[in-house]
A protein has these predicted regions:
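Basic, Lys/Arg-enriched alpha-helical interface segments
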Residues: 1-64, 72-79, 86-94
Length: 94
């Protein structure tokens, strides 16, 4: 998969060093994967949540943080839309 919005991940992991290893591993996994269905993501990320419009919420570091991405299964693109703390995510989703 190609990752768009990687700068958001780099910025976040720079500010939250405890998330860096997880994010680096996720990037490596996403870049070497070819996700064609939500189930293929679920197989590796059992706690991932799937929303409308191909939005996937990944729990980072035991749900301390959240990563929101839109998956374009047909083109192989992952668009990182947002990454932040679980508390920030809860506020966003209001």
């Amino acid at each position: 998969m190609r990752i768009a919005g990687r700068d958001k991940l780099d910025e976040f992991s720079g500010a939250h060093a405890d998330a860096r290893s997880w994010i680096d591993t996720w990037i490596a996994d996403a870049e070497t994967s070819i996700w064609k269905t939500p189930q293929e993501i679920k197989n590796n990320y059992a706690s991932a949540s799937f929303l409308a419009n191909n939005i996937v919420i990944f729990n980072v570091k035991g749900n301390r943080y959240r990563l929101e991405a839109r998956i374009a299964y047909n083109t192989g693109i992952v668009v990182v839309q947002w990454v932040g703390t679980h508390a920030e995510y809860t506020k966003r989703m209001g």
